[in-house]
Amino acid sequence: MTDKTFLVEIGTEELPPKALRNLAESFAANFTAELDAANLAHGDVSWFAAPRRLALKVARLSASQPDREVEKRGPAISQAFDAEGKPTKAAEGWARGCGITVEQAERLTTDKGEWLLYRAHAKGEQAQALLAGMVSTALSKLPIPKLMRWSDKETQFVRPVHTVTLLLGEELIPGQVLGIHSARTIRGHRFMGEAEFTIDNAEQYPQILLERGKVVADYDARKAKIKADAEDAARKIGGNADLSDSLLEEVTSLVEWPVVLTAKFEEKFLAVPSEALVYTMKGDQKYFPVYDNSGNLLPHFIFVANIESKDPQQIISGNEKVVRPRLADAEFFFNTDRKKRLEDHLPRLETVLFQQQLGSLRDKTDRIQALAGWVASQIGADVNHATRAGLLSKCDLMTNMVFEFTDTQGVMGMHYARHDGEAEDVAVALNEQYQPRFAGDELPSSAVACALAIADKMDSLAGIFGIGQHPKGDKDPFALRRAALGVLRIIVEKRLPLDLQTLTEEAVRLYGTKLTNTKAVDEVIEFMLGRFRAWYQEEGHSVDTIQAVLARRPTRPADFDARVKAVSHFRSLDAAAALAAANKRVSNILAKSTDKLNESVNAAVLKDAAEITLATHLVVLRDKLTPLFAEGRYQEALVELASLREPVDAFFDQVMVMAEDEQVRVNRLTLLSQLRELFLQVADISVLQ
């Protein structure tokens, strides 16, 4: 039998748009794993996904599993027969499990003994007998947080299922998947093409669906068409479409037959901050905003219809009518909010809870104000501006605009602060206090904004750890992992002279008697050092490089960064492996020794040439290294320390460390201790593999 193309399509009601790609990719990965586990040879596995279907197409699927030889070793002959030569119960049970009698078993003889052996030729199963079950298994493993039941069925899936098609070439594979019998029926677009049609051969998919059903099943092709058509539409009106990938993905998952159209709104709405308008267009309506070449919002938007209309203007007008009330709301909120100063919203923050044990948002504001001022004093920022930004930091949460359009928090604070005549760096800080919001996001641009962003995040870390509610597993309701990494990124990338120890102590101190966890400072620092580990692993640094630095527990993030980069560079040196091994050896020797070491090496006690040479090198190096360590020039320091390879190797080759003479032994141990201490000024390189 020849290899054939296999098709599975699951026809559903509208699938969750934000999960569609993940569902399809997981389906393909799961089914591929099932094929491989069943030893069914196959070619490429392609996936297709549209709002009402998930499908896979497998090229060159083998018609059956390969035949195989089966061998099962039974009990040893000594255990298989009793003294009279009769089969024991163990032998009979084994034979029964193999479907034979003991007498039919073969014997396997090796140099270790003799055993009963069952050998058979197992014929591979036909693919058609396996496929329905494999599809069901692959679907059952999809990442679906909430399952649905429908009708009177016990079956559960992400959305109700109406059709299942399993085709191997031209052959319909019988069976049930998700309670639905396999059939040749394919459903087309809801309003275009044929509502239902039959498919004769797996090779016809997805072209038959495109031609007869008016559905573009190829997800990436659909996405590419939307992107290209939207870019073209924007060019025609002299603009550039905001085609953020997340929205492009969502829109792709909402339509089966994409038709890109351009609409407009009244220019008067451009007086409203563009962020609020864009929030409405992108978040609520799934429209693509359009900007001019200077980055200014144009009074146009691009949207994607799911139908090819004879009168597209009617669809355009309908969308313009839908968005106008939302833009009018934004205009009203903006004008209403500006009748009050931002500071006037402070009293209302007392009515909003930050956390039951930690008080209101007004309490948090007071702490942020104080901590932002403290941070500003440490990093050379304007303390008055930082404290002012801290005072106003949460006021915009009480405005009508932010209440209605939650994602505009921060940015609306900036606009309202400018309207009130606040200093520009104060206004900008209100917007940038939440940065970085995600991996790769921009950092706050000014020192005042950095002070506010650090204060806001550290207040949350100190408070939540202070009441013993640190993140556990994948539960992190206060987004403390993101907050910790944000603080570290700001300090490291802005090269700020902040120490996590004093920073955390100040954040905890500002809570007064509210905190119950006496270990909060240490736990916050350990948590943040753990975030360092995750961050640097993603940056490509090896685990043991990071561990070497963590062993020293440096609490100044900029210093930590310099050490990691220094150790990574050190590893590229020829001497690195030998010196890491030597440090490990020194560490073990010192750990096992019970001798009390001297404060310094006694030159008069040095005997062997190798130990004299090493001691001399250490004296010279110590003078060179002292200013390098003081200035945090760790890479230069480790390059200098690499010069110790030859004297260290010679020392271990020629010198007996644990000499019988106590004075000599202690002097040599002291020498090794001083060697190790020099390396420990940077990191514990003994952990390097």
UniProtKB/Swiss-Prot annotation:
GO cellular component: cytosol
EC numbers, comma separated: 6.1.1.14
One GO biological process term: glycyl-tRNA aminoacylation
GO molecular function terms attached to this record: arginine-tRNA ligase activity; ATP binding; glycine-tRNA ligase activity
Annotated keywords: Aminoacyl-tRNA synthetase, ATP-binding, Cytoplasm, Ligase, Nucleotide-binding, Protein biosynthesis
Catalytic reaction equation(s): tRNA(Gly) + glycine + ATP = glycyl-tRNA(Gly) + AMP + diphosphate
Assembly: Tetramer of two alpha and two beta subunits.
Name of this chain's protein: Glycine--tRNA ligase beta subunit
Organism of origin: Pectobacterium atrosepticum (strain SCRI 1043 / ATCC BAA-672) (Erwinia carotovora subsp. atroseptica)
Gene responsible for this protein: glyS
